[in-house]
């Protein structure tokens, strides 16, 4: 945050136009970019939010359940949740509680915070491959580890950790937002729901969804592991930067 503010405040010294500053990142970096944009709003020209994790309230999304079947020994590994427990300063054994959505209390599951990640409201059916998951989308709400919830309640209510739960006024002040998601990514739905929410609030936003893509696909635009999907993703990002900055 301090670095971005310094760049914006010292454009002349740095030889850049502060009106043309963009921020972006992928995965956890996408989360960071979105969080910084929540604070700086339209001081930024645009944000690139690529295969982002944008909420920690619901780990039983359709995308999570669909895609842990694939690449689950690498980028879609359930062990990835340990990164989250480390970030929250929790022992790794709590990761399993998150996977079951047992980290939130029964009352929290019925609160406005879960409305922000309600897939009936924010997840278009066209992105879902598995009809059975869509048909059985409604989750039980009468359970939860109250002790764990009390430990992390502040984190669960913090939009700088979960930008998807930010209030409408804050989200409505965001700059142009380019969101990239991949069909075989277990955090796929976060970016799609973010796009739908911004659209609802009349924020200028574009979603680039690659049904055949996976979480790190943008890392393969060249070299011995070059993939067509990697080339396409990077080309689309370049197009956005050229057209919007």
Predicted regions and their residues:
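Alpha/beta-hydrolase superfamily serine-hydrolase fold, recognizing
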Residues: 1-245
């Amino acid at each position: 945050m301090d670095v971005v503010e310094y760049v914006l405040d010292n454009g002349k010294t740095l030889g850049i136009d502060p009106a043309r500053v963009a921020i972006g990142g992928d995965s956890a970096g996408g989360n960071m970019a979105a969080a910084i944009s929540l604070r700086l709003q339209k001081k930024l020209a645009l944000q690139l939010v690529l295969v982002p994790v944008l909420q920690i309230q619901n780990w039983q999304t359709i995308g999570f359940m669909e895609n842990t079947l694939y690449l689950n020994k690498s980028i879609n590994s359930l062990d990835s949740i340990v990164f989250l427990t480390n970030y929250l300063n929790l022992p790794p054994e709590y990761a399993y509680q998150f996977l079951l959505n047992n980290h939130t209390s029964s009352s929290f599951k019925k609160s406005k915070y879960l409305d922000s990640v309600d897939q009936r409201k924010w997840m278009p059916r066209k992105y879902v491959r598995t009809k059975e998951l869509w048909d059985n989308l409604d989750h039980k709400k009468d359970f939860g580890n109250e002790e764990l919830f009390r430990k992390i309640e502040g984190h669960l209510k913090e939009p700088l950790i979960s930008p998807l739960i930010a209030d409408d006024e804050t989200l409505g002040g965001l700059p142009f937002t380019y969101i990239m998601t991949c069909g075989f990514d277990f955090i796929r739905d976060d970016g799609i729901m973010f796009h739908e929410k911004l659209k609802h609030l009349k924020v200028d936003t574009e979603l680039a969804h690659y049904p055949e893509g996976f979480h790190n696909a943008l890392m393969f635009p060249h070299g011995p592991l070059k993939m067509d999907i990697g080339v396409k993703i990077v080309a689309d990002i370049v197009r956005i930067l050229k057209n919007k900055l």
